[in-house]
Swiss-Prot record:
The keyword Signal applies. Expressed by the venom gland. AXPX repeats lie at residues 23-26, 27-30, 31-34, 35-38, 39-42, 43-46, 47-50. It comes from Vespa bicolor (Black shield wasp). This is VESP-VB1. The lineage of its organism: Eukaryota, Metazoa, Ecdysozoa, Arthropoda, Hexapoda. It is found in: Secreted. Residues 24-49 form a propeptide. The modification Leucine amide is found at residue 62. Antimicrobial peptide. Shows activity against both Gram-positive (S.aureus MIC=1.0-3.75 ug/ml) and -negative (E.coli MIC=7.5-15 ug/ml) bacteria, as well against fungi (C.albicans MIC=30 ug/ml). Also promotes important mast cell degranulation. Shows little hemolytic activity on rabbit and human erythrocytes. Its mast cell degranulation activity may be related to the activation of G-protein coupled receptors in mast cells as well as interaction with other proteins located in cell endosomal membranes in the mast cells.
Amino acid sequence: MKMSILFLFALIASLACLQLTFAAPAASPLANPGASPEAAPLADPLADPFMPIIGRLMSGSLGKK
C-alpha cells in the first residue's frame, strides 16, 4: 500500500514537472500576446531540480539509509 501511494505521488510530480518544462508561461501566446515564440528560450530538461528526487522515488531508495 505504501509503495502504491509513493508511486502515485511520483507520477503526479513527474507530470507536473513535464508540464512546467514543456508549457512555459513565457512561451504561451495567451500569457504574453506581444512576444514571439522564437524569443522564448527553450527549457533544458536536464536543469530540472526535481528529476533526481523523482528518480529516487521511483527506485524506492528515497528515505533509506
